[in-house]
Amino acid sequence: MNHSSKKNKNRILRNKARIYCDVNLHKPKEYWNYEALNVKWETQDDYEIIRKIGRGKYSEVFEGANIKNNEKCVIKVLKPVKKKKIKREIKILQNLCGGPNIITLYDVVRDPQSKTPSLIFEYINNTDFKHLSPTLTDFDVRYYIRELLHALDFCHSNGIMHRDVKPSNVMIDHQKRKLYLIDWGLAEFYHPNQDYNVRVASRPYKGPELLVDMEDYDYSLDMWSLGCMFAGMLFQKDPFFHGHDNIDQLVKIVKILGTEEFYAYLDKYGIVVDHTILSIIGKHPKKPWSRFITKENQHLAVPEAIDFLEKLLRYDPAERLTTREAMEHPYFKPLSH
């Protein structure tokens, strides 16, 4: 893959966000310069671990409690990673604190001996998405997707890309009809002329730009991931694009969206993809979305849902709906504002 990266340095056209492009230009440097963050570590003695509730590549997650007031919390114990990455996550959580549907960071603590850092978050009475999704009504899907858009619009408007949107990073308290976007460990500040690491997001939710080494991606990466998640909900098939490796992931996408628009996207930006990969991809017509509609999902896969999906799952990042445009889509009309 590196071979194509070098070639892609001299591309004919660079990509730029269509919305919120210069947000960080108008913010003070300390807003986005997370490496300069001086973390004020608190003592972890105020918190106790109750039970393990999850684990990721970079952390282990526990249900915990604040001993002082007996309030439940979530304790995210970070595995050894670069200091820079921890600072980035903390800075982003601080910047977004209080935003709509954004998980609240209560505290940052570390073990005085081992120096292992932990992040303390509000507790959410979460229903596992895999179990919840099949039970959701048409109205529920519209409602929760719009709630997720509120969180994404807030983070994008604050100059931040999440870069790991997927069902397991969306917590839903269905009783309270509250949604939270969690796990900001891969989130990053958007600067229009910066190149970014393409090794982000989980494979089924990776945008085509990541799979072809397009390093000048932007917020619209999150809109692709949202589209994948939405497709999974609509057609009750999650993950919707299920590749076994990154090349196979691209093949899965191309077999549905077709090769014609894929090559048009590569040509527009002058993206070079390895010949061996192109030969694996081959040539495929675009599949109509109606192919995926069944008796079981037709109550969800209504025409305006398909129209909305189609406007998210575009190869070209510049063609995808922005968060603002997405919220204006007729699909959300039935929700009272």
UniProtKB/Swiss-Prot annotation:
User: What are the BP-aspect GO terms?
Assistant: asexual reproduction; DNA damage response; DNA repair; regulation of cell cycle
GO CC annotation: cytosol; nucleus; protein kinase CK2 complex
Q: Where does ATP bind?
A: 53-61, 76
**What GO MF annotations does this protein's record show?**
ATP binding; identical protein binding; protein kinase activity; protein serine kinase activity; protein serine/threonine kinase activity
In this protein, the active site sits at 164 (proton acceptor)
Q: Which reaction does it catalyse?
A: L-seryl-[protein] + ATP = O-phospho-L-seryl-[protein] + ADP + H(+); L-threonyl-[protein] + ATP = O-phospho-L-threonyl-[protein] + ADP + H(+)
Q: Which keywords appear in this protein's UniProt record, sorted alphabetically?
A: ATP-binding, Kinase, Nucleotide-binding, Serine/threonine-protein kinase, Transferase
Q: Do you know which Gene3D superfamilies this protein is assigned to?
A: Phosphorylase Kinase, domain 1 (3.30.200.20), Transferase(Phosphotransferase) domain 1 (1.10.510.10)
The record's subunit annotation is: Tetramer of two alpha and two beta chains.
**Role description:** Casein kinases are operationally defined by their preferential utilization of acidic proteins such as caseins as substrates. The alpha chain contains the catalytic site.
Entry protein name:
Casein kinase II subunit alpha
Identify the gene encoding this protein. casK
